[in-house]
A protein has these predicted regions:
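Viral RNA-dependent RNA polymerase
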Residues: 1-613
Length: 613
């Protein structure tokens, strides 16, 4: 494996970040999109042998990637890609790949229907649209505020230049075993806009996102926390919508062609005349212009302590038309609106279902449909009329309708929902659905962190304890999680938490950061004596935003085990054995792998589960 063991730091093993290899080359194979201008020093099309020649020198360019906090219980390697020549090439080439043009007849029908939806459901919400620049600005970190300071203070003019910078996100990812071979994941490439683009688009897009969420726009699931999801599942259950259809759009960002972008641009043009913090023409330019320049640049030596002293290496740029950039403000909002509109077209036009006969959750490229149990083949055929469906029917010759492709389409029930890397179970005693992390991802990824490259033993112990306490917000009384989560509990030395004050942020005329939020966070952190490092503070803050207000009760443990026994094919006795082995630090790999590779999907049709004792 290329995830090479590097050294020990404070008794914890530390691993190097990863470079590309011959297995990641296949994701770069393909022709450039029409109109794409390739000005990168590495040729657009190279052989696997030449591809490997650009691998970075471990002694000069590799950063420390992951620290292992506790022993792992699964054999799957965990890797972390970094920004280097090869990974940047991989990212920029995937962004520039050719995507099939949508069919003209589909475009005409879909645009007509979609515009009608926008006129009746979205346009009325925008008539009284308002946004607060102060609220958006106060929500930024100090570093983010300094980044946009020249334009915030009027020191510089915003140029009409739609420029982005490509980089590789440091993110821990699991390497999975597929047919006896390790299947390497793609690196996470981010096209980050220049700071002045964030200044122009950020306040308005954030307000649109809040507006859609507050008015429960059909399918819009941005800003929903786990309590909201549990309540939503309860509503679906009360309406008898037990059957679920889950899917994921493959390569959505680069698949978003000009005609699909028009779905979002209708709203942007409608609110452009209400933009006051900058020139409205700039707002329309950055959100409605087709041509984008994406730069490729990196530091020659990726050493963390002296990064500012390293020379900047420019690898070139590409000019591309009509795609979504993964790091821009409208990415989550725009993709959610787009995918929900496409799924609604399948349900309401192709299948001729009433809008109120089903429920829909969409966030980015993930979606779940909740409906009354029906013929699965009918649903498959309907999706084939809109999406490229190789994931549904590998042997069939399929056509692109919308120009987008489904990665998979999975049928199940409410308790089979794994929306956005979460799992769901129903506690009959509490009469509610509970949302947790996915069990396999929790066991595989949690032991590793990328936040502690130069931490002291004291800081590491505080970070581990922060993970333990924050996980208790959603895993309390669930033995399958608690038995492993208890490994992170550390002895924490008393330490003084330095409270961040509002004056640390750059003030604006009509508001400061909400002091109540700071006090609330400080109270929670003081209770557990958490060190004031930002990485630990963020761990707790994410728990407050996303995790449930009330943790699971003791009665939830039985129902969680029952769901896992159905999903993974374990008996209740085997689940107790798994818990015992994990608590006693005994090997448990055989039982876990058998369950996670369980192929019996009969539970997906078990619609009467909720009615049984």
């Amino acid at each position: 494996m290329e995830n090479l063991f590097l050294r020990y730091t404070n008794k914890y093993p530390v691993y190097q970040s990863c470079c590309g290899n011959v297995k990641t080359h296949k994701s770069t194979v393909g022709e450039l999109a029409p109109g794409c201008v390739w000005n990168v020093k590495i040729p657009a099309n190279i052989t696997p042998e030449d591809y490997q020649k650009h691998q970075c020198d471990p002694n000069q360019t590799k950063t420390i990637g992951l620290m292992q906090l506790v022993d792992t219980i699964l054999p799957n390697p965990v890797i972390c890609y970094h920004t280097c020549k090869l990974n940047l090439y991989n990212a920029i080439k995937r962004q520039a790949l050719y995507v099939q043009k949508p069919e003209d007849d589909f475009v005409e029908k879909f645009n007509k229907w979609s515009y009608g939806i926008w006129e009746t459901e979205i346009r009325p919400l925008l008539d009284d649209f308002k946004y607060s620049y102060a609220n958006w600005y106060n929500g930024l970190t100090r570093a983010q505020q300094l980044e946009i300071k020249p334009w915030h203070n009027g020191e510089q003019e915003v140029p009409f230049a739609n420029n982005f910078n490509m980089f590789c996100k440091l993110e821990k990812q699991e390497v999975t075993l597929n047919n006896g071979e390790w299947d390497w994941p793609k690196n996470r490439c981010i096209s980050a806009p220049e700071p002045y683009i964030k200044f122009v688009t950020g306040p308005v897009v954030s307000a649109l996102q809040e507006l859609y969420a507050a008015n429960n726009v059909k399918g819009y699931c941005v800003d929903k926390n786990w309590d909201d999801l549990g309540s939503f599942y309860n509503k679906c259950m009360s309406k008898g919508l037990y059957m679920t259809v889950q899917g994921d759009i493959s390569g959505l960002d680069r698949s978003v062609t000009k005609f699909l972008l028009e779905i979002n641009r209708l709203s942007y043009r409608a609110v452009a005349d209400k933009v006051f913090h900058c020139n409205p023409e700039l707002f329309k330019f950055f959100l409605c212009e087709d041509t984008t320049k994406i730069n490729c640049k990196m530091f020659e030596k990726m050493t963390m302590k002296f990064r500012g002293m390293q020379s900047l290496l420019k690898l070139g740029h590409i000019n591309i038309q009509g795609t979504r950039k993964s790091g821009e403000y409208p990415t989550t909002h725009g993709n959610t609106e787009l995918v929900s509109r496409l799924i609604r077209y399948v349900m309401e036009v192709v299948l001729n279902r009433d809008k109120d006969s089903y429920e829909l959750l969409v966030k980015g490229d993930d979606f779940v449909i909740f409906m009354v149990p029906c013929d699965q083949e009918e649903i498959r055929e309907a999706f084939k009329q809109v999406f490229e469906t190789k994931g549904i029917n590998p042997d069939g010759k399929c056509k692109y309708k919308s120009g987008t492709a489904l990665k998979f389409l999975k049928f199940g029930t409410i308790f089979d929902t794994d929306f956005c890397s979460t799992d769901t179970f129903y506690c009959k005693d509490c009469q509610t659905h509970r949302v947790t992390r996915k069990l396999q991802r929790y066991y595989t990824l949690t032991p590793f962190t990328r936040n502690l490259w130069s931490a002291t033993p004291r800081e590491i112990d505080n970070y581990k304890n922060a993970l333990h306490v924050s996980d208790k917000k959603w895993s309390s009384n669930l033995e399958l999680f608690e038995c492993f989560g208890s490994r992170f509990k550390s002895q924490v030395w008393p330490c003084r938490l330095k409270r961040g004050k509002a004056k640390e942020k750059i003030p604006v005329e009509d508001g400061f950061i909400d002091e109540n939020e700071i006090d609330h966070l400080q109270e929670y952190m003081n209770k557990y004596q958490v060190f004031h490092k930002s990485m630990i503070r963020d761990t707790f803050w994410n728990s407050y935003k996303n995790h449930p207000e009330k943790p699971p009760k003791e009665c939830c443990n039985y129902w969680h085990k029952k769901i896992c026994s159905i999903k993974y094919g374990w008996t209740m006795e085997e689940i107790d054995e798994i818990i015992r082995r994990i608590k006693n630090y005994e090997p448990v790999e055989d039982l876990l792998l058998r369950g996670f590779n369980h192929n019996d999907k009969t539970y997906q049709a078990d619609y009467d589960f909720y009615l049984r004792g």
